[in-house]
């Protein structure tokens, strides 16, 4: 049975995560406040960001950058800037 949460990102009730996807306090916050739909949107942005900036997840600085972008996107409403990318709705 799925659980319903109020998603901070979507600003509406939505299906919550099945389990904590990220470690620590930030992971608890994501589990409690971010829906599956919002997390999928972040994963799409994350993949683009890793590829375009050629981030290496073995590098602690790159992981820190990605975590900050995640917080900005999910909790602060900031768009992820990916150089050279124009969203479909803005073309």
UniProtKB/Swiss-Prot annotation:
Claim: Iron is one of the keywords in the record: yes
Alphabetical list of Gene3D superfamilies matching this protein: Fe(II) trafficking protein YggX
One Pfam assignment: Iron_traffic
Keywords: Iron, Stress response
GO annotation, cellular component aspect: cytosol
Gene induction: By oxidative stress and SoxS.
Keyword hit for Iron: yes
Origin superkingdom: Bacteria
GO biological process: cellular response to oxidative stress
Record GO terms (molecular function): iron ion binding
SUPFAM superfamilies: YggX-like (SSF111148)
Subunit field text: Monomer.
Family from the record: Belongs to the Fe(2+)-trafficking protein family.
Protein name: Probable Fe(2+)-trafficking protein
Organism: Escherichia coli (strain K12)
